[in-house]
Amino acid sequence: MRINFYLFLILIVFISCSNENQIYEISVSSESEIFNKESKVSLDIKLNNFLIKVEDLKFFINEKKVSKVTNLSIAKLGSNSIKAQFTHNNQKKILIKNIDVYNTDQPNLYSYEIIGEYPHDISLYTQGLEFKNNILYESTGLNGYSSLRKFDVYNNQLIDVRFLDDEYFGEGLTILNNKIYQLTWKNRIGFIYDLKTMNMEKSFNYGQSSEGWGLANDGNNLYKSDGTEKIWIIDPVTLKEIDNIEIVTDKKKVKNINELEIVDEKIYANTYQFNKDVVLVINKLTGSVDGIIDFGNLRNKVKQHNNLDVLNGIAFNKKRNSFFITGKRWDKIFEVKIIKN
């Protein structure tokens, strides 16, 4: 009897261990190594790396039901969630697998033409730049030096300035509905100012976004970068993050998205991704990188000094149909026309 009891215990342990070692996963196979919206994929279930047959199998991509063989045209660019529901050995299972979907086309290469140069305070650690009524507004960074500035760039005249408390590191800014929105870097807080008086009215906290980098608007919502591959869409009234897009090329996600400007449904964003002064032209709806502008030569045209830093200011002037570009501790602002090659 004692031997049978021990055999029974061994059997229980064996069954338990067998169940613990059962690793289910979703298999996603395709002819292409990199998924894009034209990819056709086959979805299956694997158990311990072997394909198996299951019952009541259903697949979903971002909660939309799909067939086992499906086209990724319904997917969004960036991260996508694949869910499987099925029954195996009389047990109901739910699995989740994330895949990345990239842009179908390579980015176009853009060039630029310098059509003007203007003085810029060489001491300013520029973090954000935007025009309103032909007046340039600038946000600057560094703890103890961060500020919000109102500037007549054509006459080299500082009109007004507001300084942040020393604990705050200023970042991007944008202007919408007669309000100035300004970010801070790691404090996870932003500030709202009255456009006319430049007096601070209130602050707001970040949601899921990790940090504050760049800020822009499309006339309806705010668009905020946080140093990752994501740009967050924010309701300007509730200040809640309502959605996000992920920035991708045909091969990779692009992180370190920084200063932003939105023109004609395109987001112009500078990035440190390529270790040079580059601005990406991004589809505002999908996150695809449609173009790349290499501004690397601009830094050679400003005064060279030990504290000279990267390009980090881009503002569009609607009246002149041109962009104004500067950088951290640059002594010039460049007016440029962007040319699609």
Task: Give the residues covered by each predicted segment.
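C-terminal motif of bacterial Sec signal peptides marking the signal peptidase cleavage site
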Residues: V13-S16
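Edge beta-strands of extracellular beta-sandwich domains
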Residues: K68-T70, Q91-N103
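A short helix->beta-strand "capping" segment at the edge of beta-propeller domains
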Residues: Y102-S123, V153-I159
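A short beta-strand motif characteristic of beta-propeller blades
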Residues: E113-P119, Q157-L164, N199-N205, D243-K252, ...
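Beta-strand-rich domains and repeat architectures in extracellular enzymes and scaffolds
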Residues: I115-S147, V161-T174, G327-R329
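Beta-rich, blade/repeat-based domains predominating
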Residues: I122-N133, D166-N177, G207-G219, K251-E265, ...
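Conserved beta-strand positions in repeat-built beta-propeller and related beta-rich domains
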Residues: E138-L142, Q182-N187, K224-T228, A269-F274, ...
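Short loop/turn segments that connect beta-strands within beta-propeller blades
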Residues: F151-N156, D194-M198, D235-L239, N283-G287, ...
